[in-house]
Amino acid sequence: MKRFLLSVLFLYGIVFPACCKTDIYVVAVGISDYKNISDLRLPEQDAKDIAKLYKTKTKHVILLTGRYATKARILQSLRDQFARADEDDMIVFSFSGHGYQGGVCPYDMSRDQSSGITYKEIRSILKQSRAQRKMIFADACFSGGIRGGSSSANINDKDSGVLLFLSSRSGETSIESGMMKNGFFTAYLLRGLRGGADVDRNRVITAKELFSFVHNGVVEKSDGQQHPVMWGRFDDGMVLMDWR
């Protein structure tokens, strides 16, 4: 009788329901050649490499680069992509390009900050998603200005489950190097997510592990000129990448 009952449970998906499979939804943006402001060298490669990494884990990846990364298209992509996520899923917005204190610069950014995309706008879209794990990675100058430049790995914030990992403190630039194919922050972010941050070798990358790896690597590589910051209300053990 017990054997029959167990068979029925498996048959109807009660023991291991398919609905509980975790998926990842990603929007990766990189802008090197801007319409109205100065150009950069590495952001589009940053975005392509982030997208390539996540494509090994999910089919739900949107990549926007150059002239395709307008303000309207970025915001619509975030809304459409993240609305598809379920509660057990994870959503990721990665941006590489120009930034200002409080936001990031789309392709059609002008000298007027109203043409930019504020972190408040981005977080508002993330908060509407059902996903419990929500991440923003931003490799952009002055990105830490959103929170006054704190370097804490777990700053109290009202947006539960939203993790922001930003490449620099307020007032700092995010460094590009001719010796590397990615910006300092994205280079260490990629290394960390690929396994470099897995200090306990359990094939799971947590928020605490990633912050320590990226922060220490970037500070050393930049000779103390750039300090990545992470904040939001989240558990230090929040899983950001699972290679099991």
PLM region spans:
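Cysteine endopeptidase catalytic domains of the caspase/legumain-like
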Residues: 3, 7, 16-244
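Repetitive helical segments and hydrophobic/amphipathic motifs
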Residues: 11-12
